[in-house]
Amino acid sequence: MANKGPSYGMSREVQSKIEKKYDEELEERLVEWIVMQCGPDVGRPDRGRLGFQVWLKNGVILSKLVNSLYPEGSKPVKVPENPPSMVFKQMEQVAQFLKAAEDYGVTKTDMFQTVDLFEGKDMAAVQRTVMALGSLAVTKNDGHYRGDPNWFMKKAQEHKREFTDSQLQEGKHVIGLQMGSNRGASQAGMTGYGRPRQIIS
């Protein structure tokens, strides 16, 4: 962000709207989960958007996070012993995390762009990606998730049903509720259309 000048006019307005989407309460929950999932050696960030960005910026913590969701021996991201100090190495580490998260099942619409994190352009998108990763981990329930399962929403899972041919045939003869009831109402006492009403005293 050192090379980027201040925003004015419409750009400033757009950036302001993006920054308002950042959720400080969600940040606390995500930090708790990351620390619980990766271990206390990852440390804790300073509070706020900037602290969260600096904490995750080099991609090492994110890589450890996605690796912790896999069994030993099949970790998708190689984590360097010393955090990378060169800018392109840090961006490459973040890109490896994004690829591993996508392979884990996070949809492209839930993914942030590398610059969103690296330049702090859209930290709410970073939160969305980590949130989606947590939701998937809770949904998979494969024993690798650590933390409170109530921190994330469980995604809906497919529930296939198999019907026999006889069940399908029976279903064709049932009057659906959208059609109304076939009981109670009858045409008893009604006269045909066009006939005058007969009043006999």
From Swiss-Prot:
> According to the record, where are the Calponin-like repeats?
175-200
Q: Which domain of life is it from?
A: Eukaryota
What InterPro entries does this protein's entry cite? Calponin-like, Calponin_repeat, CH_dom, CH_dom_sf, SM22_calponin
Q: Which cysteines are joined by disulfide bonds?
A: none
Q: Which residues carry this modification: Phosphoserine?
A: 166, 181
| Residues annotated with N6-acetyllysine modification | 172
- Any coiled-coil regions, as ranges: none
Subcellular localization, as worded in the UniProt entry: Cytoplasm
The UniProt entry, under SUPFAM superfamilies, shows: Calponin-homology domain, CH-domain
Where is it predominantly found?
cytoplasm
Show where the Calponin-homology (CH) domain sits.
Answer: 24-137
Instruction: Specify where the region named Could be involved in actin-binding lies, as residue ranges.
Output: 154-161
Q: So what family is this one in?
A: Belongs to the calponin family.
Name listed for the protein in its UniProt record? Transgelin
Species assigned in the record? Rattus norvegicus
Protein's gene: Tagln
